[in-house]
UniProtKB/Swiss-Prot annotation:
Its EC number is 2.1.1.-. InterPro entries: rRNA_ssu_MeTfrase_G, SAM-dependent_MTases_sf. Specifically methylates the N7 position of a guanine in 16S rRNA. Belongs to the methyltransferase superfamily. RNA methyltransferase RsmG family. This is Ribosomal RNA small subunit methyltransferase G. Gene3D superfamilies: Vaccinia Virus protein VP39 (3.40.50.150). The gene is rsmG. GO terms for molecular function: rRNA (guanine-N7-)-methyltransferase activity. GO terms for cellular component: cytosol. Pfam families: GidB. Keywords: Cytoplasm, Methyltransferase, rRNA processing, S-adenosyl-L-methionine, Transferase. S-adenosyl-L-methionine binds at residues 78, 83, 129-130, 148. It is found in: Cytoplasm.
């Protein structure tokens, strides 16, 4: 029960309770991740303990921000193997989670996980972030856009802020050192209709890892010119 106790402690740290039923869903998720990872590149993290800490607990820590408890709709942009979107959906069944990924094989995996876990509050979409944000049913439609993708804040802001409603939030799950990155993304955040609200440090149980939740509030509409076409966002970040 070591992992259960560890995850319970992590959940309690952010004001949540982890039920046995929720824990069992996480274990099924872990097993599917390990099984599928042998044929589809989903994660470099494959050991039980590492998955629990670096994927599950890291995702649960998003709830340190009350926005994740209060939001009705969330989009996880570039979700990959489903982080943080699926853990968020497991912990809060009142939030409707949209998982967005550009690789069809990963979307197939996400659909399987959603089915096996019986998650009625999750839908997976196959699309590039730049393309999805131009769809009327997705653009400026979510209380939260989140991402744990490996990209700098300027790039992530252009990928994510177009999905956020006015007065909603873009919340990025970042590593330990974000100060310089935040400074460099100031123009991008402002241009895209956002305002930096907070940088919130979180600790991962039973590790020395410290991560940051970067919180951006959407204060005005995103200009129609954004996001730019595929490729331009990463090649020429807004500076």
């Amino acid at each position: 029960m070591k992992f259960y106790d560890l995850m319970c402690k992590a959940a309690q740290d952010v004001g949540l309770e982890l039920s046995k039923e929720q824990y069992e869903k996480f274990i099924i998720y872990k097993n599917l991740l390990q099984e599928w990872n042998e044929k589809v590149n989903l994660t470099a993290i494959t050991e039980d303990e590492e998955i629990i800490k670096k994927h599950f607990i890291d995702s649960i820590k998003a709830f340190k921000r009350d926005e994740f408890k209060e939001a009705k709709t969330l989009i996880d942009v570039g979700t990959g193997a489903g982080f943080p979107g699926i853990p968020v959906a497991i912990m809060n069944e009142n939030i409707q989670v949209t998982l967005l990924d550009s690789l069809n094989k990963r979307v197939n995996f996400l659909n399987l996980v959603t089915e096996k876990l019986g998650l009625k509050n999750v839908v997976a979409i196959h699309s590039r972030a730049e393309d999805g944000a131009r769809q009327k049913n997705l653009r400026e439609s979510f209380d939260i856009a989140t991402s744990r993708a490996v990209a700098n804040m300027s790039v992530l802001s252009e990928f994510c802020l177009p999905y956020v409603k006015i007065n909603g939030h873009f919340i990025a799950l970042k590593g330990p050192a974000v100060e310089e990155e935040i400074k460099d993304s100031d123009k991008a955040i402002t241009t895209l209709g956002g305002q930096l609200l907070d940088i919130c440090e979180v600790e991962i149980e039973d590790t020395e890892l410290k991560h940051n939740l970067v919180v951006v509030k959407k204060i005005k509409e995103c200009p129609k010119a954004y996001p730019r076409k595929a490729g331009n966002v990463t090649k020429k970040p807004i500076k």
